[in-house]
Regions:
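Membrane-interface helix-loop junctions and terminal tails of multi-pass membrane proteins
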Residues: 1-288
């Protein structure tokens, strides 16, 4: 393990909120975009001819969602915020000490707010479209009870969430770290293609909260928030136990090559960013 290159995560609450709000805003905005686009894709697939196979529809939705996730992760803003896009991922990184307390709370709030914004925007758009008679389309997020049963759905959530976090930890802390975003996007696409018949809840608690914001948690569906949270926490233990690793470089799926990092960062890309910033400062001081 190298030295911690960024201590931004150690700022007091007020300072963190004042200085790190751009990263929080990015998380909220990107999740709103993701929910809106996936929802519109789902609506479009519902409009395919009746003989279209459900698997074909899910394939197209998954393909579009996976491409969008990859684009968000590797975008300049995505590299800045880390593109968690999921409270369970943020809390897993918080557990390994890479995210400060203030940032973890603010990220979760921003993620839920972004999902709410995306759901409301989706409903508003569908309400004014001529073909707005389809139910709110959000693959892997809507059905209150699956055909496979709630127990199976919860197990699928738990396993998939653990697989997602283990993949992120294993790849982002290896020589393959540049491929983490691509592999994550492929896994997201695969889940949207293959998992809905078993689990329509997904592995993102923020999305489930946003969809159920109308008060349907009275029937106990809030328990569906637990499997993805527990699955990703267990993935941290699996990373340490089975892969025999303790070191986590940073809390980003794709790291930026310039600018600050608000996490407790030990990533080589941050070292490069600091070196570039130092060279630029020296150049400006010489020219002054």
């Amino acid at each position: 393990p190298g030295d911690v290159l960024s201590t931004e995560a150690d700022r007091p609450w007020r300072e963190a909120l004042r200085h790190h709000w751009p990263e929080y805003a990015i998380e909220a905005f990107y999740l709103a975009v993701l929910v809106l686009v996936v929802g519109l894709l789902g609506a479009a697939m519902e409009r395919l001819p009746g003989e279209a196979e459900p698997m074909a529809r899910r394939f197209l939705v998954g393909l579009g969602a996976g491409a969008l996730v990859a684009a968000l992760v590797y975008s300049p803003w995505g590299r800045r915020s880390g593109s968690h896009l999921n409270p369970a991922i943020t809390l897993a990184y918080f557990r390994v000490g890479k995210v400060g307390t203030a940032d973890a709370v603010a990220y979760v709030v921003a993620q839920v707010a972004g999902c709410l914004l995306g759901v409301w925007a989706l409903r508003a758009i569908l309400a004014v479209l001529p073909a707005a008679v389809v139910p709110l389309p959000m693959p892997a997020a809507l059905a209150p009870v699956t055909a496979a049963g709630e127990a199976v759905a919860a197990l699928v959530q738990f396993v998939l969430a653990g697989a997602v976090m283990l993949l992120v930890l294993a790849t982002s802390n290896s020589r393959w770290y540049r491929a983490t975003g691509v592999l994550y996007a492929i896994l997201v696409a695969g889940m949207l293609m293959l998992v809905p018949p078993l689990s329509d809840f997904g592995v993102n608690p923020a999305r489930l909260l946003a969809v159920d914001a109308t008060g349907r948690f009275a029937d106990g569906r809030w328990l569906n928030l637990l499997p993805p949270l527990l699955g990703m926490q267990l993935a941290v233990d699996a990373y340490r136990l089975f892969l025999r690793r303790e070191h986590v470089m940073c809390a980003k799926l794709a790291h930026n090559t310039h600018g600050r990092c608000i996490f407790r960062c030990q990533h080589p890309q941050q070292a490069r960013a600091l070196a570039i910033a130092s060279i630029r400062r020296r150049g400006r001081s010489r020219g002054a």
